[in-house]
Structure formats: structure tokens, C-alpha cells
């Protein structure tokens, strides 16, 4: 447990030190965020805020892992590879947005192909790893379910859904950072309790790095994580839950991600079928904004909900 604590502290301080170095550099090279023209008008003033800030917690996590974990387990390396691999896709997307000077990076089908390809690699490895296999734990029943030949397609869809859901959540200052900080803290404790010590250290390190990043990402944000950060976080959550055989648990503890994704799906379906929108704007955090909620209130409420969902998730194990 002490190792988890000082892992958090080291990653936190590294991320804190990176901010004053990286933020001016991104400003200098004009790596600014383009804002959706159809988004809330209050967000237009955020145009030009440096993006690709996910580099801060990715580097902090990588450096701390190298310092703390002398002999990383295979499972910790899987999580780290997923974290970095999906982050690279996000970095490509962010770079294209910056070069084009508009909020249009990879096309939807291009991004999905890349996400599915990397998801497929991890799904295949997991299915053929004797320590992971093709079974998953069913929350509340405390039983396992062997998916057999359906495991690989399930994990591929699961990774794609998780990364996209976290990406959709990253729409307000500090929102995705705060929610994922809580989720990773929970996964660190669960990993530790299940005997996956090195994996628990990875989760703790990432939580610490996110806490340090939050100093610069909280309202008013000095930097955005970009797709570099959000896809990396989705990949990390996906990989850790996959290793623990707990992908279904993410639906509970990551209820905010699920809500954000479903709000977009229902909004699109409703408009196509009836010509009417369910929400004032999707994802749903924008609906609350347009209903008069300040960004900080939305973030606070979503964090409280996540804490409650993590407690429910704990009771389900």
C-alpha cells in the first residue's frame, strides 16, 4: 500500500513540473484548440487554449513507471501499451486538427479503423493469455462467464466503446480528468485487493499524474488533454478492466461515460426519426450548461455521481 501512495506522489509532482514547461511550448508552436462552432457560445473564448495536454500525464506515467517498477509484470505492460497506443491515435487526430486549424482531425471511419485495429490486437492477446483468458466476471453474481469465441469481438467493441465514451466526456474543463481520476483510484484499489500489485501501481501512478494535470486542466483550463489524453485514458481503463476480467464493471463505475455516450446516441436517433432533439445539446454535459449550470457545477455533480457509482461497484464484487 505504501508503494501505491508514493507512486501517486511521484507521478503527481512530475505532472506538476511538466505543466510550466509544456504549456508555454504549445503556445509558442500554436498548438491551440479549435472550438466547435455549434457548441455553447461560452466556449468560443476558449479558442487557442493549448491542446494535446494528455502528453503531460502520459509522460508522467511513463517516467514514474520506469522509476518505480523495476520488473513490470506482463499485465502492467499491457495496460501501459494500451495507454500509449490509443494515445498515439489521439495524437494523430489532434495534430491534424492543429494543422487544419479547425475541429476536424481524422474522419470518423479512419479513427474507428485505427481504434478497432489496436483493440483487436489486445483482444487477441488477452484471449490467448492463460492468465486472462476468455471469461469475464459478472458483477453482483460474483460468477464468471466464459464468452468463448465471442470474447474477441466483445473486447474489440468494448475497447472502441470505452475510448469513444471517455472522448465524449472530455468537453468541460476538468471533467474527464476528474471522473477518470476517481475511476483509476477505484481500479488501483481493486487491483491491489485482487493481488495484481504491479497493475495497481500503474493505476495509482496514472491517478497521481491526473491529479497533477488537474492543476492546469481545471476551470479555467490552461490546457486541454485533447484526443491524445482522452483516448489514452479510455485505453488504460479498458486494458485494466480487461486484465481483471471486469469489463462489465466499467459500465457501473464509468456510468458518467455511459451517460455521455448514450446521450449522443439518443440525440442522433431522436432527430433522425422524429426531427426533434431530446436534449438542448449533446453530449449531456452541454445540456446542463445550456440549462444554466456553470461548468464547475457540472463537474462537481458528475464527480459525486462517480464516487457513488464506485461504491456500488465495490458492493458488486
From Swiss-Prot:
What's the stated role of this polypeptide? Catalyzes the initial step of the lipid cycle reactions in the biosynthesis of the cell wall peptidoglycan: transfers peptidoglycan precursor phospho-MurNAc-pentapeptide from UDP-MurNAc-pentapeptide onto the lipid carrier undecaprenyl phosphate, yielding undecaprenyl-pyrophosphoryl-MurNAc-pentapeptide, known as lipid I.
Could you tell me where this protein is found in the cell?
Cell membrane
Q: Which GO terms describe its molecular function?
A: metal ion binding; phospho-N-acetylmuramoyl-pentapeptide-transferase activity; UDP-N-acetylmuramoyl-L-alanyl-D-glutamyl-meso-2,6-diaminopimelyl-D-alanyl-D-alanine:undecaprenyl-phosphate transferase activity
Catalysed reactions listed for this entry: UDP-N-acetyl-alpha-D-muramoyl-L-alanyl-gamma-D-glutamyl-meso-2,6-diaminopimeloyl-D-alanyl-D-alanine + di-trans,octa-cis-undecaprenyl phosphate = di-trans,octa-cis-undecaprenyl diphospho-N-acetyl-alpha-D-muramoyl-L-alanyl-D-glutamyl-meso-2,6-diaminopimeloyl-D-alanyl-D-alanine + UMP
Q: In which pathway does it act?
A: Cell wall biogenesis; peptidoglycan biosynthesis
Biological process per Gene Ontology, one example term:
regulation of cell shape
Q: Which Pfam families match?
A: Glycos_transf_4, MraY_sig1
Q: What's in the GO CC field? A: plasma membrane
Name the coenzymes or cofactors required: Mg(2+)
In short, the EC number is 2.7.8.13
Which InterPro entries does the annotation name?
Glycosyl_transferase_4, PNAcMuramoyl-5peptid_Trfase, PNAcMuramoyl-5peptid_Trfase_CS
Q: State the gene name recorded for this protein.
A: mraY
Identify the enzyme class: transferase
Q: Which UniProt keywords apply?
A: Cell cycle, Cell division, Cell membrane, Cell shape, Cell wall biogenesis/degradation, Magnesium, Membrane, Metal-binding, Peptidoglycan synthesis, Transferase, Transmembrane, Transmembrane helix
Give membrane topology per the record. Multi-pass membrane protein
- Record protein name field: Phospho-N-acetylmuramoyl-pentapeptide-transferase
Q: Which family does it belong to?
A: Belongs to the glycosyltransferase 4 family. MraY subfamily.
- The residue ranges crossing the membrane are 4-24, 49-69, 76-96, 112-132, 147-167, 186-206, 223-243, 246-266, 297-317
UniProt key word Cell division: yes
Amino acid at each position: 500500500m505504501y508503494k501505491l501512495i508514493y507512486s501517486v506522489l511521484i507521478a503527481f509532482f512530475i505532472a506538476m513540473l511538466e505543466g510550466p514547461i509544456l504549456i508555454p511550448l504549445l503556445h509558442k508552436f500554436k498548438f491551440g484548440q479549435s472550438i466547435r462552432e455549434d457548441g455553447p457560445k461560452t466556449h468560443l473564448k476558449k479558442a487557442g487554449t493549448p491542446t494535446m495536454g494528455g502528453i503531460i500525464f502520459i509522460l508522467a506515467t511513463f517516467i514514474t513507471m520506469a522509476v518505480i517498477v523495476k520488473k513490470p509484470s506482463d499485465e502492467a505492460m499491457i495496460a501501459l501499451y494500451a495507454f500509449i497506443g490509443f494515445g498515439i491515435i489521439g495524437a494523430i487526430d489532434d495534430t491534424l486538427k492543429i494543422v487544419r486549424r479547425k475541429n476536424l482531425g481524422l474522419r470518423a471511419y479512419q479513427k474507428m479503423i485505427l481504434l478497432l485495429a489496436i483493440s483487436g490486437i489486445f483482444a487477441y492477446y488477452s484471449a490467448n493469455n492463460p492468465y486472462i483468458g476468455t471469461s469475464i466476471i459478472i458483477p453482483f453474481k460474483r460468477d464468471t462467464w466464459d464468452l468463448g469465441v465471442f470474447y474477441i469481438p466483445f473486447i474489440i467493441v468494448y475497447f472502441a466503446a470505452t475510448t469513444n465514451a471517455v472522448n465524449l466526456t472530455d468537453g468541460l474543463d476538468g471533467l474527464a480528468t476528474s471522473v477518470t481520476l476517481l475511476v483509476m483510484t477505484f481500479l488501483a484499489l481493486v487491483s491491489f485487493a485482487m493481488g495484481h500489485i504491479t497493475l495497481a501501481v500503474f493505476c495509482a501512478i496514472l491517478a497521481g499524474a491526473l491529479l497533477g494535470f488537474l492543476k492546469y486542466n481545471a476551470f479555467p483550463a490552461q490546457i486541454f488533454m485533447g484526443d491524445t489524453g482522452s483516448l489514452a485514458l479510455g485505453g488504460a481503463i479498458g486494458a485494466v478492466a480487461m486484465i481483471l476480467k471486469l469489463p462489465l464493471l466499467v459500465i457501473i463505475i464509468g456510468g458518467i461515460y455511459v451517460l455521455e455516450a448514450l446521450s449522443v446516441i439518443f440525440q442522433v436517433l431522436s432527430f433522425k426519426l422524429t426531427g426533434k432533439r431530446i436534449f438542448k445539446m449533446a453530449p449531456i454535459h452541454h445540456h446542463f450548461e445550456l440549462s444554466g449550470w456553470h461548468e464547475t457545477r457540472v463537474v462537481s455533480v458528475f464527480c459525486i455521481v462517480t464516487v457513488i457509482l464506485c461504491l456500488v461497484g465495490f458492493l458488486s464484487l
